[in-house]
Structures are given as structure tokens and as C-alpha cells.
């Protein structure tokens, strides 16, 4: 049987010094026979999704200790993409994913932890911890801080979120008072932003991967039911320790759970719920850490066969994550996918022997279990707060309408093809990504003239000064992982296009990426990126570009000979922006850029250079 990793530092006379230090943390003689379980928290007062996490690590720790383990908590960094957006702060967001993954690895391996509980929530924290858990491959459970409640105001007949505030602020017809009212109401509570943005998408995907408990992605941060998720995470990690160290059960380990089939399940869910395009980036990165050969080609294949069964903000103003929970949460969507034979139900999870067994237990349509129904009635209270577990509101009924509700069955899908698509062509030879869930059907085929910008800042200036006209395709390049560096999100350009009334009249194409809050014909992750010699760097103002989502194609309409000629010219001058940028790139960011791969590889480090 496997031995506790922690014995390396707790067993034998030669470890007397290490034990002395362990004792200084509060450990006693009996504790040296127990599993030492690391709790990776991510509390910070900078991020609304993390402001309430301060005491939650100790909540998990006390449960672990009650059940016979030793719990040791540490913290990782956490960047708020919304606060970092629109300025050079966004250069640090994606690189922070690698820092988080490394820091969890460093702490767990330096101290020989036997298992891990990951308390994550926002955009790069869940992916970073996911990468670390698959790299370490020790028993691991994820539990997130939970989604924010949606905002409300008398100025709108729909719920609000961060994007509403951004779009209204750029609308010249909106008064300062109106903007201020929406701003104050858009983000009322602690938690990750209330739509199907990147943070919530990733927390939902951990359910499909099998690494978190049901409800992890959908119980709002303020609800008392989420406390039980944290306690259950402590219980579950102890059970996983017993299964691995006591019975050598490989399905107690992250790599035994997050198999190729599980990654297919995760992206199938992602496509069905119209998740953020960033999830593709992060799943590709996580798969590499798991040593699973899961690629853009697999995503492309699945995207053609999976319908969209759930539509949530920013793809509609009608529903937010709290509404997904009322409709049965992620297991409600998984159940419909299983009924359509689109899931691998024989894969393991941290809480059930198989995903199929879990669906049978947690599907509100298939079960009569009143406890399950009560769980999914957990709702929002509409009271501004930064306190976790502070309310116990429940909906009077569940949303079980699979014809016109928040979650649909296969027959009544929002669209027969899913919410994400991979496009290929002569300006994205290794692929690019579009969230079709946010694209109006009238522009699924779009042809326009290119207007090229060498940075996000230049594009924002151009959009706000009316350089961009109907029928144009805005090209923003040298914003990839290497070229940015850091692959900035383009939420401001897309939001400003909407505020200018161009959301259905223009497209945007970039080697950068998009916030989960983005909608419209926004195509990102162009690979190879411009800084790596990608053909997006060869596009010129006025070039005609054709986008064909049904055919999964994107091409600049010039000859191969012209492209080849331009490539020779570009090689001669180097793959760098044509206009100088005032951007300050620190040595830390330069180090990231040296090793960064393009988006089709998950923007992970190029290990061949190590």
C-alpha cells in the first residue's frame, strides 16, 4: 500500500528537527500517524469572489481534524480580472494561473502533504489549482466560494451583472445618475460574478470532471447550504485518503478521476451550457498536467454534436447562475446530456463510484428525494453582503420546465449545436474559438473588411472615436500569451461595440482572449498568435475576412501567394507590433512570455525549453 507522503518529514530520528517544527505548529505525538492534509485557500480582500473565504479554510480544517486528519492551511494569490481589466493590470491575469499552480505544488511538495482541499472561486484560481492537483496527483477535493447573487434595480426589468454596468457606462445616452445606480446594484454580494462567466464556468466544470461536490458551481455564496459543501469537502478528502493510502484505489486520485472521458464530459457540459471561451484554454492546460491527450481537435469534434441546453447571462438577460441552481444545477444539465447519450457515465467522482450513480441521486427530474429537491431550491435573498452563509432563502418551487425553462431537454434545446465552436482557416491554422451562445444567428456567416489594431488600448480608442463602422471586422493582435504578454481579455472592446450599437454589425478577431462576460461575434485564441508567427499578423487594413460558423471556418480572402509574400516581409522585420506601445512589461512578465505557448496548447509553458 502507498505510505503517507508526510512520513518523509515525520518518521525516524533524522527527522527530529522537522518534527520539532511540526510541534511548533500545534501537532502532538498522535498526529504524526495521521494524514497531513493541505488546505489551499485563496482569501483576499481584493476580489469579491474571495472576500468571504477568510474563515472557511478553518471550517474545513476542523472537520478534517474531527475525522482523524491533520489540516494545514495556506493561501495563494488571486487576481480580480474585472478590476485588472482595461489597463496593464490585465497582463498579469493569465500568468497568475501558473503562479497559483506552482505555489500549490511548492507548498504541497515542500511539506510532503498527503492530500489537498482547494478553496477556489474566481477566474484563474480554479484553473491554477486544478493544474496543481493534477500535477501533484494526491487525493484532492475542490470547493468554491460560490457565485454572487444577481443584481436588481428599478431601472431594469431584468437582473443585472458587471457587464450591464460596463455597457451602460459607455452609452452616451445614459445619464451619470443612471450609470451610478446600475453600478451600485450590479454586484450586490460576495461571490464570483453572477453570470456564466469564466469563474462560474470553471466551478461548474469541476463538477463534471468529478473533482467537486454537487452544487459547487451553483449554490450562491451567501446561502447557508454552501456551509455544508465545505464540511462535506473535509469529510470527502478523508475518505479519499482512506481509499488511496488504505486500499490503493486509483480512482481516489485526480488522474484516476479526470481521465480523457472525464475531460470529454467537461467540455460537453461546457458546450451545452454556453460557458466562457476561457474554459477551453484552462481545460487544455489541465489536460496536459494530467498527461491526457485532450486537444482542440477533440473540442471541435464534440462541439458539432452537442446542443445548447442552458442559456445564462451574458448570453441572455433572463437567467443567471442562481436560476441554473433552481433548475437542478449542473447535475440537471448532466442528466439531460446523459439521456441524450452524450456523456461517459462510468467515470469516477470524488463523491460517487460513478457519474451515472451521482446523476441518479442528484437529478431533480429523476429523483423523488425531498432532500435533493430542497437543496436545489436554495436561492438569493437580495441583501447586499460580504458574509458567507448569511441567508437561507428558498424558492417556493423548482424550475422543472425542460421545454421553456432555464435548462432544456434535447428535444427543446436552445440550439441544436452547442454554445462553443472551434474555427480553422488561413489566419487560424491551429484554431480559434467563438462562444456561439452569445452570437445572434443572423451573423453566423459574416464577411467584412479588416480594421487592424496592434493592442487592446488602440482598439478601444478607435471604437470610442467611431473609427469602427458597420460591416468591419476589428482585428486586435499581439495580445496573445507571448505577444501581450499575458493574453489580455477583450471585454472592454466588445462592450464598447455593443454600447455603440455595433454588436450585430461588426465582428472582433484576436489572438487575445475574452472575458466570460463577452457576447457578440467575438473570436479569440487565434493560434498561432502573431508573436509566434501566426497569420493574424499578416492581415492588413481593408482585407476582406469571411467568418462561417456553420462551416467552422475563418479566412482572409487573399491568395496564398500574397500571404506568402507578406510572410517573407514580416520575417524580415520581425514578428512585433507595427506601432510602438507604451506598455510596461516587467521582468516577471518577460519571463512568462519566454516560455508561453499559444492558446491551442492552453497557453502553458513550453516544456521543451526547460
From Swiss-Prot:
HAMAP family: IlvD. [2Fe-2S] cluster binds at residues 122, 193. Its cofactor is [2Fe-2S] cluster; Mg(2+). Functions in the biosynthesis of branched-chain amino acids. Catalyzes the dehydration of (2R,3R)-2,3-dihydroxy-3-methylpentanoate (2,3-dihydroxy-3-methylvalerate) into 2-oxo-3-methylpentanoate (2-oxo-3-methylvalerate) and of (2R)-2,3-dihydroxy-3-methylbutanoate (2,3-dihydroxyisovalerate) into 2-oxo-3-methylbutanoate (2-oxoisovalerate), the penultimate precursor to L-isoleucine and L-valine, respectively. This is Dihydroxy-acid dehydratase. It comes from Xylella fastidiosa (strain Temecula1 / ATCC 700964). It catalyses: (2R)-2,3-dihydroxy-3-methylbutanoate = 3-methyl-2-oxobutanoate + H2O; (2R,3R)-2,3-dihydroxy-3-methylpentanoate = (S)-3-methyl-2-oxopentanoate + H2O. Transmembrane segments: none annotated. Mg(2+) binds at residues 81, 123-124, 489. The active site is at residue 515. Its EC number is 4.2.1.9. The keyword Transmembrane does not apply. The gene is ilvD. GO terms for biological process: isoleucine biosynthetic process; L-valine biosynthetic process. InterPro entries: Dihydro-acid_dehy_C (IPR042096), DihydroxyA_deHydtase (IPR004404), DiOHA_6PGluconate_deHydtase_CS (IPR020558), ILV_EDD_C (IPR056740), ILV_EDD_N (IPR000581), IlvD/EDD_N (IPR037237). One of its GO terms (cellular component) is cytosol. Keywords: 2Fe-2S, Amino-acid biosynthesis, Branched-chain amino acid biosynthesis, Iron, Iron-sulfur, Lyase, Magnesium, Metal-binding. The lineage of its organism: Bacteria, Pseudomonadati, Pseudomonadota, Gammaproteobacteria, Lysobacterales. PROSITE patterns: ILVD_EDD_1, ILVD_EDD_2. Homodimer. The keyword Zinc does not apply. Belongs to the IlvD/Edd family. Binds 1 [2Fe-2S] cluster per subunit. This cluster acts as a Lewis acid cofactor.
Amino acid at each position: 500500500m502507498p505510505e503517507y507522503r508526510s512520513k518523509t518529514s515525520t518518521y525516524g530520528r533524522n527527522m527530529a528537527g522537522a518534527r520539532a517544527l511540526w510541534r511548533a505548529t500545534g501537532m502532538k505525538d498522535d498526529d504524526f500517524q495521521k494524514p497531513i492534509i493541505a488546505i489551499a485557500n485563496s482569501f483576499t480582500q481584493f476580489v469579491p469572489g474571495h472576500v468571504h473565504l477568510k474563515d472557511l479554510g478553518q471550517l474545513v480544517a476542523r472537520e478534517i481534524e474531527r475525522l482523524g486528519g491533520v489540516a494545514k492551511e495556506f493561501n495563494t494569490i488571486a487576481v480580480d480580472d474585472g478590476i485588472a481589466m482595461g489597463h496593464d493590470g490585465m497582463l498579469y491575469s493569465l500568468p497568475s494561473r501558473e503562479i497559483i499552480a506552482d505555489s500549490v505544488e511548492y507548498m504541497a511538495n515542500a511539506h510532503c502533504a498527503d492530500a489537498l482541499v482547494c478553496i477556489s472561486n474566481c477566474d484563474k484560481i480554479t484553473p491554477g489549482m486544478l493544474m496543481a492537483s493534477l500535477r501533484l496527483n494526491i487525493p484532492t477535493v475542490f470547493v468554491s466560494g460560490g457565485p454572487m447573487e444577481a443584481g436588481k434595480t428599478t431601472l431594469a426589468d431584468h437582473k443585472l451583472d458587471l457587464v450591464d454596468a460596463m455597457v451602460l457606462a459607455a452609452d452616451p445616452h445614459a445619464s451619470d445618475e443612471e450609470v451610478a445606480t446600475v453600478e451600485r446594484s450590479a454586484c450586490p454580494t460576495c461571490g464570483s460574478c453572477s453570470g456564466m462567466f469564466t469563474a462560474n464556468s470553471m466551478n461548474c466544470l469541476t463538477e463534471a470532471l468529478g473533482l467537486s461536490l454537487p452544487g459547487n458551481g451553483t449554490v450562491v455564496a451567501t446561502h447557508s447550504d454552501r456551509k455544508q459543501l465545505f464540511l462535506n469537502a473535509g469529510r470527502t478528502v478523508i475518505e479519499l485518503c482512506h481509499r488511496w493510502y488504505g486500499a490503493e484505489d486509483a480512482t481516489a486520485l485526480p488522474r484516476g478521476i479526470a481521465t480523457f472521458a472525464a475531460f470529454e464530459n467537461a467540455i460537453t457540459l461546457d458546450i451545452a451550457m454556453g460557458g466562457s471561451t476561457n474554459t477551453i484554454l484552462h481545460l487544455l492546460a489541465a489536460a496536459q498536467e494530467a498527461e491526457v491527450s485532450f486537444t482542440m481537435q477533440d473540442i471541435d469534434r464534440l462541439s458539432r454534436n452537442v446542443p445548447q441546453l442552458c442559456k445564462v447571462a451574458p448570453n441572455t438577460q433572463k437567467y443567471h447562475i442562481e436560476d441554473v441552481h433552481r433548475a437542478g444545477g449542473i447535475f440537471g444539465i448532466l442528466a439531460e446530456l446523459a439521456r441524450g447519450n452524450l456523456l461517459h457515465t462510468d467515470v469516477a467522482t470524488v463523491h460517487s463510484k460513478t457519474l451515472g450513480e451521482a446523476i441518479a441521486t442528484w437529478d431533480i427530474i429523476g429523483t423523488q428525494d425531498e432532500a435533493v429537491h430542497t437543496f436545489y431550491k436554495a436561492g438569493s435573498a437580495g441583501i447586499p453582503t460580504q458574509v458567507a452563509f448569511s441567508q437561507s432563502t428558498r424558492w417556493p418551487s423548482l424550475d422543472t420546465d425542460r421545454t421553456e425553462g432555464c435548462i432544456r431537454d434535447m428535444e427543446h434545446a436552445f440550439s441544436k449545436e452547442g454554445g462553443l465552436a472551434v474555427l480553422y482557416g488561413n489566419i487560424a491554422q491551429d484554431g480559434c474559438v467563438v462562444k456561439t451562445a452569445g452570437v445572434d444567428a443572423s451573423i453566423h456567416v459574416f464577411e467584412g473588411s479588416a480594421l487592424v489594431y496592434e493592442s487592446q488600448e488602440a482598439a478601444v480608442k478607435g471604437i470610442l472615436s467611431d473609427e469602427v463602422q458597420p460591416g468591419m471586422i476589428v482585428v486586435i493582435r499581439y495580445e496573445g500569451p507571448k505577444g501581450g504578454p499575458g493574453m489580455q481579455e477583450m471585454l472592454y472592446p466588445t462592450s464598447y461595440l455593443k454600447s455603440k450599437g455595433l454588436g450585430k454589425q461588426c465582428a472582433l478577431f484576436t489572438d487575445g482572449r475574452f472575458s466570460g462576460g463577452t457576447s457578440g461575434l467575438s473570436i479569440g485564441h487565434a493560434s498561432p498568435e502573431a508573436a509566434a508567427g501566426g497569420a493574424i499578423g499578416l492581415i492588413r487594413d481593408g482585407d476582406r475576412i469571411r467568418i462561417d460558423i456553420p462551416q467552422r471556418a475563418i479566412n482572409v480572402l487573399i491568395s496564398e501567394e500574397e500571404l506568402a509574400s507578406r510572410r517573407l516581409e514580416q520575417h524580415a522585420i520581425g514578428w512585433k507590433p507595427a506601432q510602438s506601445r507604451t506598455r510596461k512589461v516587467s521582468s516577471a512578465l518577460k519571463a512568462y512570455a519566454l516560455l508561453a505557448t499559444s492558446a491551442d496548447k492552453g497557453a502553458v509553458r513550453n516544456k521543451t525549453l526547460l
